[in-house]
């Protein structure tokens, strides 16, 4: 029997639609501890007003710290130690550009992780891998790939920077996008686009998620094992949406909702009434009471960060 057939009263509160995110795998962000991040931040140019402008500024800044060399740095993966070596005349390769750029981005609250790119035949070729950074850009609501060694991004036809996953898909579709270094550093060479694009045959997060929809070879030339914290059989988890929101229900003198985000630098949520346009800011873990005047309540909820509010999610409930 349904509610009407049982002649029951209507519920006081009824949720019709709420923000709901899928669980994500660990992001494996490339971060220093709080002291290390403060030391890195003190070296960096002042952040721009947007996350994209800040990321592009840091891409150029890191690329211009030193000229590329095949020399390797054998210390801890620490941007401050690498930059100290550079100040003393050191020059390094793509691994070190990637470490410094990834840690610099996290120091200014832009989520960033290291990716490793592999060309076809990496199991038998010594020159078949390349290290890059991938960053979540709040104002774009997506991940983008930043190549510190080349001071470059890859861009769609409308100028939007592309992510590692998007570039892997483009590679397998034979669709090479624009290799762009106009806004960045001194190491960029557009003539090398085809060569660098060849490294998108396989993409993994450094010591994190690896994915494939076919067979997988976990060993490079020379027998080096490609470590991963999780090996997935599809790319569905490769680019988690950090604007997504999940919802829990709590009792705060009546029913209330608490919103949650996987964005590591979120500072709260903005709740907007779609009818009155009124807005309310909620701190992290602060509850939104569902009490109020009877009626149809249609709201949006968005994650807020130091750079902007992210893509809003719908919330619809009825109070009686």
Locations of regions flagged by a protein language model:
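Short beta-strand segments within Ig-like beta-sandwich modules, predominantly Fibronectin type-III
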Residues: 276-284
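Edge beta-strands of extracellular beta-sandwich domains
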Residues: 306-320
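Hydrophobic/aromatic-rich core segments of domains that either
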Residues: 49, 54, 60, 99-178
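Conserved structural position at the C-terminal beta-strand
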Residues: 301-305
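Surface-exposed, short loops/turns at beta-strand junctions within beta-sandwich domains
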Residues: 288-297
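Active-site rim recognition segments
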Residues: 72, 81, 137-226
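Secondary-structure boundary elements
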Residues: 2-93, 99
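Short, compositionally biased P/S/T/A/G/V-rich stretches that sit at domain boundaries
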Residues: 211-258, 262, 320
């Amino acid at each position: 029997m349904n509610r009407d057939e049982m002649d029951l009263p209507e519920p006081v509160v009824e949720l019709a639609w709420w923000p709901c995110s899928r669980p994500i795998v660990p992001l494996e962000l490339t971060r220093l501890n709080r002291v290390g991040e403060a030391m890195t931040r003190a070296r960096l140019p002042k952040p721009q007003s947007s996350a994209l402008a800040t990321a592009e500024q840091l891409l150029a800044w890191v690329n211009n710290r030193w000229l590329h060399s095949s020399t390797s740095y054998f210390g801890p993966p620490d941007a401050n130690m690498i930059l100290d070596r550079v100040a003393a005349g050191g020059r390094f390769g793509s691994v070190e550009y990637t470490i410094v750029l990834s840690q610099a981005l996290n120091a200014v609250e832009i989520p960033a992780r290291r990716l490793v790119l592999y060309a076809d035949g990496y199991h038998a070729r010594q020159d078949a891998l390349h290290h890059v950074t991938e960053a979540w850009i709040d104002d774009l609501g997506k991940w983008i790939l930043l190549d510190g060694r080349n001071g470059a991004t890859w861009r769609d036809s409308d100028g939007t920077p592309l992510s590692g996953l998007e570039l892997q898909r483009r590679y397998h579709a034979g669709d090479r996008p624009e290799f762009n270094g106009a806004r960045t550093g001194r190491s960029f060479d557009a003539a090398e686009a085809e060569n660098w694009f060849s490294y998108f045959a396989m993409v993994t997060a450094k010591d994190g998620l690896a994915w494939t929809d076919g067979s997988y070879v976990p060993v490079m030339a020379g027998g080096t094992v490609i470590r991963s914290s999780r090996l997935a059989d599809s790319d569905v988890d490769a680019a988690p949406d950090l604007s997504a929101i999940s919802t829990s229900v709590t009792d705060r003198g009546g029913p209330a909702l608490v919103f949650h985000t996987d964005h590591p630098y979120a500072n709260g949520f903005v709740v907007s009434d779609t009818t009155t346009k009124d807005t309310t800011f909620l701190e992290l873990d602060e509850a939104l009471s569902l009490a109020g005047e009877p009626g149809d309540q249609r709201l949006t909820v968005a994650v807020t960060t130091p750079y902007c509010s992210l893509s809003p999610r719908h919330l619809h409930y009825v109070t009686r």
